[in-house]
Structure formats: structure tokens, C-alpha cells
Amino acid sequence: MIDQGRISVLSEEGDYLLVDKPLDWTSFDVVAKIRGAYKRNGAKRKVGHCGTLDPKATGLLILATGRKTKTISSLELLDKAYEGTIRLGAKTVSHDTESEEYDLRDVPSLDERAIREAATSMIGERMQQPPMHSAVWHNGKRLYELARQGHEVKERKARQIEIHQFEITGIELPYVHFYIRVSKGAYIRVIAHELGELLGVGGYLKSLKRVAIGQYQLSDAMSVDAVVDEITRAASVIEE
């Protein structure tokens, strides 16, 4: 008997694949890997993704295959939830670990209550300017490309975002652990930087894991290798 769950990954109608993106992979690296697996198994399929994750972030990435790629825009409207760690008392130009620390400060005098209240004060709608180290387009180039060339675009258009929930889950100074749920288009790196500014000591995003996109959960995701294996198994079942 053919396992319909297995062959669904080869359906021309397409499907959503929930993938746990590894550290240091770009979102396109994941797409390319899955697209290559289809091609090697004789099944050319369109593959796209919803909600870019930075290379230094891990967690849930939704891939759409086949005709499902036409529905990606609807998925991008969904709220996203993350768990992560902010390093207080230091800054980086990228607001994460992609660049070197500077402006280091001692933070032993920071009050835990003040940290939690600062996070709570950020909940709600706010305008957010995309960071230079981002995939936003400017005059035909990505901002991160310009940043790597040493250029800064000061007139980056701010966008309205909403922080629905921002909970501090642990404090081990200089590190602060958090859970956050945000609207489409929010940069968690910028939120980490802004929290550091509110506290007067600076801060950057040390680590980040996306745990949910709308109703889709990281707990239901597969590793990249597991998805590749599933495509290979499905192809072998059909050949039999």
C-alpha cells in the first residue's frame, strides 16, 4: 500500500513544508537544498519560502511547493513568535552577531524590574526603520549589500509594526532571555537594539529562534535532511 503522506511531497498541487532552519544557513540555502532534492529525484517543483530568517537565526521556515507557492503572500501576513537572547551592555552595527561588538559597558547595576518594564513598554504599535543589514531593496540593491560596501542609507523608510507580546523569560546579566510575538515585517534585531537604548546601556541580539508563524509551530517542523529524505523515499515509492 502506498503511503499517501509520503507521496504528498511530490504532488503537483504542492504543499507546505515546515522546516527547522539551521544556524548560518540563509533562507535561500534551504530553498535551494529542497529544490535540488526534487530535481535529483526527477520531480521539478517550484519552491518558495515565507518569512525570511537571518543567517544567525534558527527555527521555523515555511516552504511552499508547486501551486502552493502562489499562496505565500497570505502566509506572510501571519504573526510570528520567537524565543531569543539579548546581550546588554554592548552594541554591533548589524544589531546581531554578524558584526563585532563595540561600546562595551558594565551592566551589574541594572535592575531586573526595570528590564521587564522596558520590555512591556514596547508592546503595541510602533514605527520601525529597517536596519542597514537587511534584505530591503534600495535603488536596485539590497541594503545589506550597501552596508558591506561601507555605505549607509539614512533615508530608510520606516514601517508600522506591532509587538503583541514581549515577555522576559530569564535574566542572567549581561544576557536577557525573551519570548516575543510580532506582526509582519518586524525586525527582532532592531527591537533588541531599542531595548538596550531604553535601558541606557546598548544591546544586540545574541541568538534567535522562530517558534511559530500563525498556527504553524516549530514543534511540527522537520530538519532539512529529514525533508530531503522524505522526498527521496516518496520518489522511490512511486517508482515501485
From Swiss-Prot:
Q: Which HAMAP family match?
A: TruB_bact
Q: What is its EC number?
A: 5.4.99.25
Q: Which domain of life is it from?
A: Bacteria
**What positions belong to coiled-coil segments?**
none
Tell me one Pfam family matched here. Answer: TruB_N
User: What job does this protein perform?
Assistant: Responsible for synthesis of pseudouridine from uracil-55 in the psi GC loop of transfer RNAs.
What residue intervals traverse the membrane? none
Q: What class of enzyme is it?
A: isomerase
Q: Which residues form the active site?
A: 54
Q: Which CDD domains match?
A: PseudoU_synth_EcTruB
Q: Which GO terms describe its molecular function?
A: RNA binding; tRNA pseudouridine(55) synthase activity
Which catalysed reactions does the entry list for this protein? uridine(55) in tRNA = pseudouridine(55) in tRNA
What keywords appear on the UniProt entry? Isomerase, tRNA processing
A GO BP entry: mRNA pseudouridine synthesis
Name it.
tRNA pseudouridine synthase B
Under Gene3D superfamilies, the record lists: Pseudouridine synthase
- What is the similarity comment for this entry? Belongs to the pseudouridine synthase TruB family. Type 1 subfamily.
